[in-house]
Amino acid sequence: MIVIQLSDPHILAPGELLYRRFDTAKFLARAVAEINRLDPLPDVAVITGDLVDHGEPAEYEHLRALLSPLAMPVFVIPGNHDAREPLRAAFAADGYLPADGFLQFTIEDYPVRLVALDTLIPGEAGGVLCSERLTWLDYALASAPARPVLLMMHHPPFPTGIERMDRAGLQNSEALAAVVARHPQVERILCGHLHRAIDRRFAGTVAGTAPSTAHQVLLDLEPEAPL
């Protein structure tokens, strides 16, 4: 099974530029075209949050149009720039998002299970997995202990050394680690948020962040370094 991960496309309404500089729609369209040229094609694509920049319905409509040429199913999860209800409405027809509550789900149609988490705190840059979300995860993993899992979430559950990003990280990574450690079938944790690639060990598995299709964050380890 081949899974391709995209992250943090930060799509805006048609014609708008991110920070008045970055044509995020053009960058995502280019990525989609490159994915469709891969041989063999991935079985699925996943996008690990910050799908759009302001959580507006027009942005999600634009995102759907940009993703429509993909030659494989695509599954999306929220990041801190997203808004649950507009996202839910935009992708409701695809049938995998829950009708209410947190945007957490499992995809059971492939040799590897996809398990998606919602780390969003509305109005905040950082993320959290509350007891309700972690209980859901524990149950989802316990329900199929023999099947390998790719876990997807926006905020990485580890410090990166980029202080300004770490201040907007996942608040309770220790609680997540306790759940993951109980379920050795978790093969990897796919994350976004950081706008660059970092991999590390976490709770007996490997967690990693994907670069953004929109723009990258400088690897500057000085405490007051700009993004």
Where are these regions (language model features)?
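His/acidic metal-ligating clusters that form di-metal
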Residues: A31-V44, G127-V206
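Short glycine-enriched, charge-decorated loop/helix-capping segments at active-site entrances
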Residues: L17-D23, G123, I162-G169, P223-A225
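Extended active-site neighborhood of metal-dependent phosphoesterases/phosphodiesterases
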Residues: P57-A142, P148, N172-Q185, A203, ...
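Solvent-exposed loop/turn segments at secondary-structure junctions
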Residues: L51-D53, N80-R84, I121, P157, ...
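Active-site glycine-centered loops adjacent to acidic/histidine catalytic or metal-binding residues
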Residues: D8, G49-D50, G79, L117, ...
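N-terminal active-site segment of His-dependent metallophosphoesterases
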Residues: M1-H62, S143, T160
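A short acidic, helix-capping loop that chelates divalent metal ions and anchors anionic groups
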Residues: L12-L18, E85, G123-G126, P159-E163, ...
